[in-house]
Amino acid sequence: MTQLWLIRHGETEWSVEGKHTSHTDIPLTELGRQRAAELGKYLAGTTFLAVLRSPMQRARETCELAGFGDVAVVDEGLREWNYGVYEGRTSREIQAEIPGWGVWKDPIIGGETAEQVGVRADGVIARALAVAHGAAQEEREVSNVALFAHAHVLRILAARWIGLEARGGRLFALGTGNISVLGWEWETKVVLQWNRGIEK
């Protein structure tokens, strides 16, 4: 049985301000770093066959502070949604120019569509399952794979896991430094946990 552990990076200044952040490579805040270290304590009792992470600094810092820096492999598929001209802007700022604008329903000028991010997410899922399939030869009961990445790409990945279109990611809220787990109920792919704060 494969379980994918989705771990959103810790807090950044832009996440606090609600700015769309994809390719802008900014670090964690001090609180974000503290939460990332706490993640390490929370995850210490779980064995991961593989750890994949986004190449961005905020994901790398979270992964390293959680204690997985030495084993993590960069997966380009875990980059955040490319927001194009909307990078660094809040939804409120964009809506002042384009009333009713929403990232899930409107064109992303100079960036990616949700469907394109979905294709990347499908690739990540395939690679994670390939790792788990190899572990099945070792007769493991549960094969855990950790993914350190960003809100939108992880939300889309969750949607794709359960068979929704990429835009189905709009149904999943995901806070900074929080953990979600995807897995199986018999032969059906399911969400086992979602948006779990480690303080809970």
Where are these predicted regions, by residue range?
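Acidic, low-complexity terminal tails and accessory targeting/binding regions
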Residues: 2, 81-92, 134-137, 141-143, ...
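Loop-to-helix element that buttresses phosphate recognition and phosphoryl-transfer chemistry
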Residues: 5-62, 109-122
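Short active-site segment of divalent metal-dependent hydrolases/proteases
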Residues: 12, 153-154
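Short, basic/glycine-rich phosphate-binding loops at helix/coil junctions
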Residues: 16-19, 95-108
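Phosphate-coordination/substrate-recognition cap region in phosphate-metabolizing enzymes
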Residues: 38-96
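Active-site catalytic microenvironments for nucleophilic, acid-base chemistry
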Residues: 42, 65, 69, 127, ...
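Short glycine-rich phosphate-binding loop at a beta-alpha junction
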Residues: 48-55, 135-148
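Internal catalytic-core helix/loop-beta-alpha segment
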Residues: 101-136
